[in-house]
């Protein structure tokens, strides 16, 4: 078993097909297929189900992937320990929820100060970003928090007001039972706050409509499709233009914190250290 066998296995698992993995790794397909077969023979167990749509992990394959991800992460960190220069460089993979209002300022400042770092930004929901940080797929992420996890180191970044957004100027709480709720998929911090509020009020929403893009939600509210709950900064432009109206909600549910997270046991590269410094320059940031 060689290191490149593990890299091939990881790529096939991530891509879901031999052809996509071969393209990603710049290998010929027959080589990828042979390496996977050789790995299965060596471990005496099938690691993938083969089907028309590609390949998916077996139960043993999923178990294998946990170890492979850890091994390859350790190899990357070993390289970083010896190759990490005083000048920040390399790739920094950062995840973020859509509504971190000062993120463009942070990224712009960081790029100007450290142009040798390639920033890779990925948007997502809080729960999936946490999972990707834990799986070493991201170096860190801005999420709705705070959270409690023994492997997570988190930094308090900011707190924002949450506003109920409607098309009409007036709003009554009973409208939750007659008007669709427009929300992100499960795993969104704003949705969790809204659902907790409705549960405490004993209200059952008429319909929940799920979206993946913030602008789609807000534009749909402006057209009268439904109502939503988002940070005030995210809806300021539409509210100022008179296209939607914002309503305060009870204080218990009316704010949400943004935190930056990373794995506690991950090697602190100069690139990450500099990124945290940049955040600190734009926010009052404390490690929780």
Swiss-Prot record:
GO molecular function: DNA-binding transcription factor activity; transcription cis-regulatory region binding
Residues covered by the HTH lysR-type domain: 1-58
Keywords from the UniProt entry: DNA-binding, Transcription, Transcription regulation
The entry's DNA-binding region: 18-37
InterPro entries: LysR_subst-bd (IPR005119), Tscrpt_reg_HTH_LysR (IPR000847), WH-like_DNA-bd_sf (IPR036388), WH_DNA-bd_sf (IPR036390)
Domain of life where this protein originates: Bacteria
PROSITE patterns given in the database record: HTH_LYSR (PS50931)
Family of this protein: Belongs to the LysR transcriptional regulatory family.
Protein name, per record: HTH-type transcriptional regulator CzcR
Species name: Bacillus cereus (strain ZK / E33L)
Gene it is expressed from: czcR
